[in-house]
Amino acid sequence: MNMAIQTIKYIFWLLPILGLTQALLQNPGDDFPFSTVIDILSENVEFSTFLRIIQKTGHVQYLNELQNFTLFAPINSAFIKGDQTTDQFEEHFHIEDFLIHDRVLQVRDLENGTYLEKRAAKAPLLLRKHERHCFVNEIAVVEPDLLPSFQNASLQGINNLLLIQPQINELLVQLDEETQDLKIFSDFISSFSNYNAYTNSSTVLVPLDVNFRKFFNTIEINYLLDKYNKLGKSNTISQAKWAADRTSLLQELIIDDVYGGILPKELILENKNNRKLFMKSNSEGTSVSVNNSDYSPISNRIFEIGVVHGFSDLDFLRTHIQFDAEKYLHGLNCSEFVKELYFRDLEKFIQNGRKITIFVPQASFNEDRGYTKPSLLYHFVEGKIDLEQDFSSLRPIQYAPTQIYDSAFCSSAKRLGGHCQKFKITRSNKGYYINGRFKILNTKPYEIGNTSIYSIDDDLQLPGDLVLSLAPENHCSISLMLLKELNLLDLPSNHKGYTILLPCMNSWDNNDLTIDYLRSNKTALNLLMRNLIFEDLIYSNNYSISTTVKNLYGNSVSIGVQKIVGSQNLTKISVSTIKESIIIEESSDIFFNQGVIHPIDQLDFPVDLEISLKELIETTGTKEIFDFFNLFYDLSSIIWNNEEYSLLVPTASSIPLSGITANSTNLRKFLELHLIPANVTQNLLDCNGSISTKLGTKLNCRKDHLDNVFVSIQGDWTKEVRVLKTGCTTNLKSSCIFLIDKPISLSWLNSEKYHLRLPGIAVGFGVIIGVTIAISLLFCIIITRGGKVKDKNQRGRNDRATTPLIQHSPIIHNPSYSATAHLSPLSQPTFEGSYSVNAIQTPRDIRRVGSDQKGGRSVSTS
């Protein structure tokens, strides 16, 4: 072994001596036999600029000592073509940018095609041979294969400068501008702060946007890119999952070392996830394929320390990434919502495989909300909701179809007895709404595994207390006022929940007097309202149930719920303590924090509550009515026995002004004029149709633009009374009291006597007689007028001689300015008669009403 080493040393010592001996023996005219790349550069003037830069930067010795390399030397014209000046080039000059180590390139030996030359710690070079022409990084080799004799090297003269290659993120931006199809991966790479650690000296398989969208939807892409810049600030668990997914995807697309151009057949490589990949190139090396994909439309694009190939159909992008609801919520810009779930230990709802439906507010409404655990749970349903499928069986008719669902908030034992709080979804022409307030933005859910996600336009709020849960359009203010007077707006916790049948909408119409009575009688008010509240949860979709519950009095009550046959959206609720069945709209339930409210548009009284005519009259304050009716036994029984009549009751202040007293001779007629049979009461309640009185007089009803109700004698609208309030008895809804602002005067009936009513035949005869008399009078006037004219002519002839030639004419008044100047006083109408039919009566001195009734029976002036 030592002998071999000694022999090699002797050889190295002898080589310079032999070279020197050959030089001494050589003739002076012969070329110098030992040349280096520096010698070649100095011997060729076209390389003078490049040589000067090498000398100036001190690389001559370095190049002389190198072996087994290729140098690409720009000719002088390259420095003129380039954008950089020579000084700028010198400033950034690195000799390694122009070298290939461990390879002596000879262009003449290259076959036609594209070749990728690796270089340690430098960007690879792309060589392309076409016929006799060769290019390096698309720069023409104009002086090929210049070989020094004293170095194992080659020099290739090129006509342009080899520029520094861009970083990978810069290259991807450039490629996206060229193709308009590389935005996603470009953003993906840029989102890594240390992407160079993955891509240096690597082959990067770049999926085009079309490739990404083939395997990832928009939500998943948003998650991978962290489009909303939230994941970096999320909880540590979410951050770790996100970082692992992104790293896995990036490593799936990176192969250590540089591969491109013409590749060996059956080339099997591994990516950074240790997945085996089969890579091949086409015959020219201009495009590559991975795992039998289509050949890359973008190939052999060089970056700082690597090469990029772009693909449209890589099939392994999704291999190492498993999506769940949590990742989808991040992709929907709901990272704050996810953070709250972790904070409340509710992350299981977005991680397990159970069927879950989530209603999540859009991004602008889920930031810094400070959710409570119950409010978060109210956004979840343990089961799948498919709106289009769930509502497909509900035909689009006049009403808005509604479905009721259980939320995941089921822990309110005190308030709801452990039952889950519900919500309802209603479909209208404008879309789907939760509890009538929160619009669902996507009718088709985002689905991942067993989870369905709906986005809503605002944060879903848990039902509040009784008052807050009722929207103004329900018109429940009167019932709420009555509940407030009974301190029933906040019900005690009963571990069961409550069901309230609440009169709303039009239920209190025509019941103003009833309200006044109830407010004045707390016993009656309690009897009504407490019989409408039940200690259990009964929903409108609990069809065909019959159960016994307790009302707020503590009494057991039987309740049945049935769907009305033949109706599309009506439900009947039967309550044993209420006289009539209650009809409600299906799914009209309103949820509050202690149960459910059923708004009803009818006022149904408990069987134990009786409101009579007597009590309603007392509520009006017109006590004189009782005195008047007590004078007539048959009439008084109407009030005391609740007979089927309604009564118009004037206000107490208007009775004295009317002149009606207990001594009035027409008192009975007055009372009968204000009594209305029950069978026509509805006409007055509806203010429609003819209204007959017990007296036989017909009344009319009208409403003004403010819905004020006025009643008058039929055929005479000049005198009318206004209905102030109405209330009906509990036994008979057509037996009511109408409080009016003043009585209907009997004098209004007397005015009818002055109206002449003649039959049609009499009118006809009158016309004939009138025409005959008119013709006769005209004939007489003509005869009389003719005689006067004749006499005047005769007298005119006799006086002509004595008549002056000029005489003053008397002043003649224009009859058009004095149409009544010649009327007799008897023919002129009086002021009273022309102003009003009532004005011809002597005015009544109201100060004397009642003052002249000394010892004698007064006579009513009405």
From Swiss-Prot:
Compartments, record wording: Vacuole membrane
FAS1 domain mapped to chain residues: 34-162, 463-604, 606-744
Keyword Membrane: yes
Topology class, membrane: Single-pass type I membrane protein
Record keywords, A-Z: Glycoprotein, Membrane, Repeat, Signal, Transmembrane, Transmembrane helix, Vacuole
GO cellular component, one term: mitochondrion
Membrane spanning residue stretches: 763-783
InterPro entries linked to this entry: Adhesion/Biosynth-related, FAS1_dom_sf, FAS1_domain
Superkingdom of this protein's organism: Eukaryota
Glycosylation sites: 68, 112, 152, 200, 291, 333, 450, 521, 542, 569, 663, 679, 688
Side Vacuolar, residues: 24-762
Cytoplasmic side stretches: 784-862
Signal peptide: 1-23
One Pfam short name: Fasciclin
Further comment: Present with 206 molecules/cell in log phase SD medium.
Protein name: FAS1 domain-containing protein YLR001C
